[in-house]
Each structure stands twice: as structure tokens, then as C-alpha cells.
């Protein structure tokens, strides 16, 4: 690896620099959007109530005023070993093509971690699409998580339960369900998901589906959010991404310790088209999340998107899937 040739400084990626970065990264992370809609999707995420305070894109700029690397930085509230803290989430790490092999990816990661330490972060995290080796050299450790297929019992038809579309007023109930599942249990790491963070995760997926609507398999992608009520509030819910390839269960919750209402929601949704074969349903299913009696988890494998953490302060990194509670919805 060649040494860094020029001094570099960390700046917010804005204006012409941001446009160049979007041009360079469009082919990798556009998710089937047009170039204009890729820019709109990124900008809209940062304008959400949660994103405007917790999400920024940065660039490394050299002495010539030229950007050489970029990354998104998220400040995510989390709990590690019973202590509330902040995770510096790192996403879309990218080095300008002609500058690769000079260590700029590691430099921007290290500078963002140093910056986040001053903002209260005790751990840094990322999802790797390029394997583990590069990030291991930078001090990251792989955190195991599971990916599963979900089979839903359809033998007895749909239960007599009202399922409706989720709304903004349901978000506090969703946050409460998550807190109940992740506090006071033998669990080492989980996000602290408040209504604003849940709304951000939903908005990100809805924006992607809306901006990408059109011909082609990705243009048929939809985000569906359903709840079952008890009284006047949500008692169980699911968030799904529906596409030509099947369903992805992005997140779910149930006030019922056994999860029976969650299972019933999925039965109701499948009963909308009773004559069609059940779609393939995939999920990251946290091991401490109860499996509803109507569901069966099969084909368990390590999650294909590799989750890695690096300590910033004196903390221990979880090393078992049993220790982590994390939904696909919070991928960054």
C-alpha cells in the first residue's frame, strides 16, 4: 500500500464535492434509482427528524482541494452491557478510484471515529460488503447475526383479527415493544430505538420504493407497515419490503410474550391471496425474539451483510449471535 501523499482534512460533503461523490458512488449504491432520484433519496434521509441531527456525509480533502474518500457517519443510540451510549455508524465508505491503495479508507474511518469520540461515541460499527479483512486491520471485530427463512402456517386460514396499515401515531408503541424486548434480558448489544429512529428507518425504505417505482424488478418494490390493535394502540406490527424476489421482514414486534399476534398478522397478509404460493420470506431474526407459534424459522445462516464493531472506549465487543438484538431495518 502506497503512503498518503498529501495532507488531508475532514469536511462535510456538500455542494460540488457532494455531487462528485454521488456521481462516483451511483453505480454501487443507487438501488436501481436514476441518478437524480439517487441524489433525492440521499438528501431526503438527511432531512428527516432523526437524520438531520444524526446523519452526515463527510469527505477527505487533500491539499489540492480535491476529495479523495467519503463516508456517511451515523450517531446511533445503543446499549452495550447495560450501559446507554452512542455508536458511530460508518456507511458508504468509498475511495476515489485513482486514489485507491493509499490508505484513505482507513484514514477517513479513523478521523470519523476520533470525531465521534468527542461526541460521546463508545463504539464504532459498520456493515461490510467486501469481507472482513480490511476492517479487521482497522480494529473491527465481526459480530455474528442470523439470517433465516420464515415459514408461516396456512393450514387453518387467516385468524379473525383486524390488521390495518401502520401510522405515525403507532411509533411510540413500536418503540415501547422494542424497549421491552431488549431491557432487563441477558443481552449485550441493541439499539435504543425511539420513535424518531423508527420513523427514519421507515422513511428510508418508503422513499426508496417511491423514487424507484417503475418498470423492472426493483421498480415493483414496496414497503408495507401493518399493525394489530388492542384498545386504541398497536399491540403487534410488521414492516416488510415486498419485491419480485419475495418478502423481507425488516422488523417486527409484539406485546404478547409469545408473539402470537405477530404470527397472526403474517397469516392475515398471506390470506390476501390464498391461491398463490407463499412468497420466500427472509429476515434477520434476533435470537432473543420469541418465534410465534404460527411460524417456523428455517435455513439459518450467518447474515450475508457482515456486522462489525470496534471499541472506541474501554468496552468489550459481543462475540455471539445470542448477545445481539438487531433488525434488518437498521442496516446502514
Residue ranges and their predicted role:
Residues 15-28, 168-184, 323-324:
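A short, well-structured alpha-helix characteristic of acyl/acetyltransferase catalytic modules
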Residues 22-79, 188-223:
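Active-site rim helix/loop that mediates acceptor-substrate recognition in acyltransferases
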Residues 57-61, 66-76, 89, 94, ...:
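Conserved beta-strand in the GNAT
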Residues 92-95, 101-114, 258-272:
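Conserved acetyl-CoA-binding loop-helix of GNAT-fold acetyltransferases
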Residues 141-251:
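Amide-forming acyltransferase catalytic core, primarily the GNAT-like/NAT-type
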Amino acid at each position: 500500500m502506497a503512503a498518503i501523499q498529501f495532507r488531508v482534512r475532514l469536511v462535510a460533503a456538500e455542494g460540488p464535492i457532494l455531487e462528485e461523490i454521488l456521481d462516483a458512488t451511483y453505480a454501487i449504491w443507487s438501488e436501481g434509482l436514476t441518478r437524480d432520484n439517487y441524489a433525492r433519496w440521499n438528501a431526503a434521509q438527511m432531512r428527516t427528524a432523526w437524520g438531520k441531527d444524526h446523519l452526515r456525509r463527510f469527505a477527505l480533502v487533500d491539499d489540492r482541494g480535491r476529495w479523495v474518500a467519503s463516508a456517511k457517519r451515523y450517531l446511533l443510540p445503543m446499549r452495550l452491557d447495560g450501559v446507554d451510549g452512542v455508536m458511530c455508524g460508518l456507511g458508504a465508505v468509498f475511495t476515489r478510484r485513482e486514489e485507491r491503495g493509499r490508505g484513505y479508507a482507513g484514514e477517513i474511518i479513523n478521523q470519523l471515529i476520533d470525531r465521534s469520540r468527542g461526541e460521546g461515541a463508545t463504539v464504532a460499527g459498520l456493515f461490510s460488503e467486501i469481507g472482513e479483512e480490511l476492517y479487521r486491520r482497522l480494529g473491527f471485530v465481526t459480530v455474528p447475526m442470523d439470517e433465516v427463512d420464515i415459514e408461516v402456517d396456512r393450514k387453518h386460514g387467516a385468524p379473525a383479527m383486524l390488521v390495518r396499515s401502520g401510522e405515525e401515531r403507532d411509533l411510540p408503541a413500536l418503540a415501547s415493544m422494542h424497549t421491552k424486548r431488549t431491557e432487563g434480558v441477558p443481552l449485550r448489544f441493541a439499539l435504543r430505538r425511539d420513535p424518531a429512529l423508527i420513523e427514519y428507518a421507515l422513511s428510508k425504505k418508503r422513499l426508496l420504493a417511491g423514487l424507484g417505482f417503475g418498470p423492472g424488478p426493483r421498480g415493483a418494490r414496496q414497503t408495507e407497515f401493518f399493525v394489530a390493535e388492542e384498545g386504541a394502540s398497536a399491540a403487534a406490527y410488521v414492516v416488510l419490503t415486498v419485491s419480485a424476489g419475495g418478502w423481507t421482514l425488516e422488523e417486527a414486534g409484539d406485546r404478547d410474550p409469545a408473539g402470537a399476534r405477530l404470527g397472526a398478522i403474517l397469516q392475515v397478509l398471506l390470506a390476501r391471496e390464498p391461491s398463490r404460493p407463499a412468497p420466500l420470506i427472509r429476515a434477520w431474526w434476533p435470537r432473543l425474539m420469541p418465534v410465534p407459534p404460527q411460524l417456523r424459522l428455517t435455513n439459518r445462516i450467518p447474515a450475508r451483510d457482515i456486522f462489525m464493531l470496534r471499541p472506541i472506549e474501554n468496552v468489550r465487543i459481543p462475540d455471539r449471535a445470542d448477545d445481539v438484538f438487531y433488525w434488518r431495518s437498521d442496516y446502514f
